A protein has these predicted regions:
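Non-catalytic, usually N-terminal nucleic-acid engagement modules in DNA/RNA processing proteins
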Residues: 1-60, 66-67
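Extended two-metal-dependent nuclease catalytic cores across DNA- and RNA-processing enzymes
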Residues: 2, 23-26, 76-183
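Glycine-rich loop at the start of a catalytic domain that most often binds anionic cofactors/ligands
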Residues: 68-73
Length: 183
């Protein structure tokens, strides 16, 4: 049986879990845990459904990236992470490490850049599944890479193969960049 790699856009899914579940979930010492709980529910469902041999969870470390070096206005209007979410990034990183899941949050790179790099690096060696809420990732869909787009809540996802991308948007995955530039 061929080995599989699942790459989870950690920032995308942690934000989705944070907003999908009530902020009343906390640890005994008062640290919010709603995003961690929702993220782990998604992760365990992915393990069950996709049965990967390898899993990686890249996420954004900070707002300072090579893109902000090139253009100060890059994502300048984006609000910072809510205070209740910030400590959950470290919690989820710790849980992933205990579970043996590769966690990558390199400074200077965005999580979705790492998702793309890993996908292109490994798709010739094994099937790759990307899990994200970021439609920009559709450009990575190929005969060896399926992009699972999160939909409503924390458990519904759409498997976006090249055929599914074409059926929904009437473009090839390689044209996603052009479509986004025109929007």
């Amino acid at each position: 049986m061929e080995k599989k790699l699942v790459i989870i856009d950690g920032s995308s899914l942690l934000y989705r879990a944070f907003y999908a579940l009530p902020p009343t979930m906390t640890s005994p010492d008062g640290i919010p845990t709603n995003a961690v709980y929702g993220f782990l529910r998604m992760l365990l469902g992915l393990y069950r459904d996709l049965d990967p041999e390898y899993m990686a969870v890249p996420y954004d470390k900070d707002r300072h990236t090579f893109r902000t070096e090139m253009y100060e206005g890059y994502k300048a209007t984006r609000k910072p992470a809510p205070d209740e979410l910030v400590p959950q990034f470290d919690l989820i990183r710790d849980v992933m490490q205990v579970m043996g899941v590769a966690v990558d949050c390199l400074g200077g790179d965005e999580g979705d850049d790492i998702v793309g790099t890993l996908s292109l690096r490994y798709e010739n060696e094994m099937p790759v599944n990307i899990v994200t809420g970021d439609r920009d990732a559709l450009q990575l869909s190929s005969s060896r890479t399926t992009v699972f787009l999160t939909q409503k809540g924390i458990t519904n996802m759409a498997a976006m193969t090249p055929e599914a991308v074409f059926e929904k948007y009437h473009i090839e995955p390689r044209q996603v960049i052009d479509m986004k530039a025109l929007m």
